[in-house]
Amino acid sequence: MRGDAGLPAPRAPLPIEAVIAALAAAVLHAVWNALVKGGGDPLMDLALVWGGSAAVALVCLPFVAVPVAAAWPYLLATLFIHMPYGLLLAAAYRAGSLSHVYTVARGSPPMLIALATAALGETLAPGQYLGIAVISAGILATGFAPHAPARATLLALCVALTIAAYSVLDGLGARASGEPIGYAIWFFVLMGGCFMAIVSAWRGPAALALYARTNWRRAAVGGPAGALGYGLVLWAMSFAPVAGVSALRETSVAVAAFIGWAFMGDPMSKRRIAGALLGLAGAEAVKPARPLHRQIAQQR
């Protein structure tokens, strides 16, 4: 079976390398989101974090090739989607807590991604689809707050739609490029530059520069975390099912819930603990039984 544009469609089980990469990316993703939420101005802080990622990528740019022509439609499309994603995410963090916004935004996409990638010809084992559904349920149980501001919930759901869209595009683009790390580096240079230009035009370059002088540590920590995490996910998606990788990455809500509880005063209820454990149980169902090198050996 082949996916979009004649690309091979990875099948279950997920390689262990992809699992490790996705789980590491989950921790890194929760960290940079906590930095954005924990600052004084989520929009400015997100610009600094993504600008920091762009700076890291810019240093690496001379050592990677320009993405092939087949990858550029996906690269430009995901770049376009990341602009409203960033603006919506910053607005959501202004309206609600880290635990609630992050959970709703990251808990909703996995099943949407699974359905979208199935339509493109990428399939998982039935138990893995069940695992993705369990992850989504656990994520939503971890942080969904029925009495949270309606604006925060609505914005988080809009963020979720952009996440589902760019995740599918990321997987297709990484495979089309043949060089997922190079693809990620080019993406971060363009994305960070574009988003900082938007924020600079909106708030003014002097205001952004002043904010950066007093909050540069967020860029120094969050920038590399974001770039490395995204690169790991793209690398994993280049040879493993997009739906499975995305679902495992969303277990980051357990990390975000802990950060919100430990450092931001978010409550840690029994429901959230049970939801986190449910999400981890779903992750176990998505995980593989064989490492990648054994799968390759059996295909030869």
Predicted segments with their positions:
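Hydrophobic/aromatic positions within or immediately flanking transmembrane alpha-helices
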Residues: 22, 46-47, 75, 102-103, ...
